[in-house]
Amino acid sequence: MSFTELLGQVGLFGGAVMVCLALLSVFSVGVIVDKHRRFRSASRQSEKFKPEFKKFLHGGEVQDLIEAGRLHQNSHVAQVVSAGIIEYDGVRQSGRDPVASLELVTSALRDSMSETLIQLKRGLGFLATIGSTVPFIGLFGTVVGIINAFRSIAATGSGGMSVVSGGIAEALVSTALGIFVAIPAVVAFNHFTGKIETFHVEMNRASSQLVNCLFKIPELEVLDVEVADVKAPMVKKGGPAYAAR
């Protein structure tokens, strides 16, 4: 019996379950493709932005870094660094206290990082839901198919293949379709979650490097210290840490 013949023997309720699974599969693939394109764009633009950021760390101009951030708006690193350097430039031009400047810059970096992470995670909840619930939808269709098979046996009084094939087909197709939809969603969710962790590390490292460069804090460990852990009293008012660029 071919697959099309199996589908032809599926009941109305089982068909509705399969249509639901097929629609969820389409939505899942759409989310996967969209996230893949966005993450690839973020990675590529970040690689292009990093040389400009390194140039700034070695004595480049503030305005050059701001312009580089505008040219690479899809880069997660550029988004965070731009938020910090724009805040720093605004505070510097206003002539505020350097201690307040550090607090404002670190706050801008934290806020931008949080917002960027929210954007990166958008859609992953849907993939997680698909991966965890679709197998149960398929199992539900399986149970319905088996029930229909037993109902056919009870109605005819015999258990021949021609009697139960419709219910069995419904059960098998529902199970297979549920697994088929769930596996890509789970794999994609785990892959994208790993990418987000990598992006988070890159954003945190860039934030720490920016604060270290702007305020000359030698004690700052780029890889180990969160931006939120930087303490304002470490900056000395009027010292080289607040030298105009």
Question: Model-found features: residue ranges?
Answer:
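Predominantly long cytosolic amphipathic alpha-helical stalk/bundle segments
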Residues: 43-137, 148-160, 187-245
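A cross-family signal for key residues in well-ordered alpha-helices
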Residues: 128, 141, 165
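Alpha-helical transmembrane segments
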Residues: 22-42, 139, 146, 181-196
